[in-house]
Amino acid sequence: MVQCTDCKKWRLIPSMQHYNIIKETQLQTPFVCGTTSGWTPNMSCNVPQDGTTCDTWPSIPPIPTGWSRSVHIRSESTKFADVYYFPPSGERLRSSAEVQSFLDNHPEYVREGVNRSQFSFQIPKPLDDNYVKKRTRPVKRRKSSKDNNCEKGKK
């Protein structure tokens, strides 16, 4: 789903190909309801929205053909989500360094035009700012004179 910049309504995108093109160009060419007229006749900002949530974020490059991208939302943690890429071989790649290592070991993908710039491990922003727990340092307990007396009595 993507959100119209004019009316702020959510629109369902029928294919990953359309979705990836919109996602890649969203900053340069903001999405508007009229964009969907190619696959949804008579679409406009006057039509009720298709949904109420969105798992997109702008400027994510399109995924190379045959590859897939997966975003795993964590249940309340210090990190909101993890992004993984899966090449046609099915391996899981968790970082830019792993992508580069994979491409170094599989030059056939490089020959097909796959390069590191086609992968983004940027995660979406949580809709609830309090979803991600803030890291805090544990409070160190200071020894009191009572603790010292207990240790002396153990001798």
Swiss-Prot record:
Main localisation: nucleus
Positions of transmembrane segments: none
Name recorded for this polypeptide: Putative methyl-CpG-binding domain protein 12
Domain MBD: 53-126
Annotated PANTHER family: METHYL-CPG BINDING DOMAIN PROTEIN-LIKE, ISOFORM C, METHYL-CPG BINDING PROTEIN, MBD
Gene name, Swiss-Prot/TrEMBL: MBD12
InterPro entries: DNA-bd_dom_sf, Methyl_CpG_DNA-bd, Znf_CW
Species for this entry: Arabidopsis thaliana (Mouse-ear cress)
Note on domains (UniProt): The methyl-CpG-binding domain (MBD) functions both in binding to methylated DNA and in protein interactions.
Biased composition (Basic residues): 133-144
Listed GO CC annotations: nucleus
Residue stretches of biased makeup (Basic and acidic residues): 145-155
Function: Probable transcriptional regulator.
Motif (Nuclear localization signal): 140-147
First and last residues of each zinc finger (CW-type): 1-53
Positions bound to Zn(2+): C4, C7, C33, C45
Disordered: annotated span: 130-155
Cited CDD domains: MeCP2_MBD (cd01396)
Motif interval(s): MBD-associated domain (MAD): 3-45
Keywords: DNA-binding, Metal-binding, Nucleus, Transcription, Transcription regulation, Zinc, Zinc-finger
Any GO MF annotation of the entry: zinc ion binding
Compartment(s) where it occurs, according to its Swiss-Prot or TrEMBL record: Nucleus
